[in-house]
Amino acid sequence: MNAWEVNFDGLVGLTHHYAGLSFGNEASTSHRFQVSNPRLAAKQGLLKMKALADLGFPQAVIPPHERPFIPVLRQLGFSGSDEQVLEKVARQAPHWLSSVSSASPMWVANAATVAPSADTLDGKVHLTVANLNNKFHRSLEAPVTESLLKAIFNEEKKFAIHSALPQVALLGDEGAANHNRLGGHYGEPGIQLFVYGREEGNVSRPSRYPARQTREASEAVARLNQVNPQQVIFAQQNPDVIDQGVFHNDVIAVSNRQVLFCHQQAFARQAQLLANLRSRVNGFMAIEVPATQVSVSDAVSTYLFNSQLLSRDDGSMMLVLPQECREHAGVWGYLNELLAADNPIRELKVFDLRESMANGGGPACLRLRVVLTEEERRAVNPAVMMNDTLFNALNDWVERYYRDRLTAADLADPLLLREGREALDVLSQLLNLGSVYPFQREGGGNG
């Protein structure tokens, strides 16, 4: 059956700031306390979405979350009106204010893990929301992510949305950032590669930085998504590269159809894994980048592998990269050698995503891949699909509501909270989402 990969990109939120909240993510921690530009960040993301849509790649948008997230501050013991809560937390515990104001939901590669209908036992598209429990600021995302996904994939006959796994370390799940699908045409059954960093009883794990994904979580997600057990492989990420800042697998590997583009040190027992894939995926091709050409450190600093590998109609592929790759002589030299070599990658497309990159999120972090048949695509909420009209409407919306300068101190401004709620009210109408945000359901209005 014909099917297409649709990229659902996260729209950067109004409180995008640099707080260094993500231990193990070296870009995040190294840019701590810099001044951010939320308006520019959102527009950079929108330009990528629109450019890819114009090239014929189906593209959609997932909206930001409500931030600062007052309900969690109340759970932490701060009381009074919303404005009083903000004032108290800013004075008594400003680190909590930064956490509940994080714009991290924009990295929707961590929103959920997706199983296309060709791979599932019941023939539905399944999405399991990620619990993201390794980081406090990200663990807050799951309930609203679930509401948003249900508003976008709202046809229950076609889509099954599963709640996040229990919020315990044993079941740490980071979503599609640790998941790859390999195979032939998108509409054919594929092999799902779940990548984990640790498992109970296995001493092989990183020592410097945390392994956020567990094998136990990956196995549970595969069950929830009803993936045919014959189409699943579980593989461990190399603990040594996690300790070098590879906090998700999509920082060291990316797949598309029959191609796996990865660093030669990406996986534990890599030769064994590639042999397994070769035996199970017709025409499988591994493009392994040697450490002698690109070090793990350079891969992390340029986000070479946090790229999008997209199929064109003629069967060739395009690699979507952040500008940092072009600015690194060694990485750019390797990429031009790659273009000249015998493989399906025929084009490099470079985007300026500096605002997201400085917080540790490249092109692949910003998108959730969902393979859909034509019938399934028609069942998606049409208001989120990128086109000229939506692009212009979202740009105008960003221009109206987003600040062009934000520091950690600005997060205590009650006006920022009101601006954000008004903006999300307007956006949820624009995208035909209904009342997906807690402040809407509580009748909080714009106050």
Curated annotation (Swiss-Prot):
The keyword Hydrolase applies. Pfam families: AstB. Keywords: Arginine metabolism, Hydrolase. The active site is at E174, H248, C365. It is an enzyme of class 3 (hydrolase). Its EC number is 3.5.3.23. This is N-succinylarginine dihydrolase. It comes from Escherichia fergusonii (strain ATCC 35469 / DSM 13698 / CCUG 18766 / IAM 14443 / JCM 21226 / LMG 7866 / NBRC 102419 / NCTC 12128 / CDC 0568-73). The gene is astB.
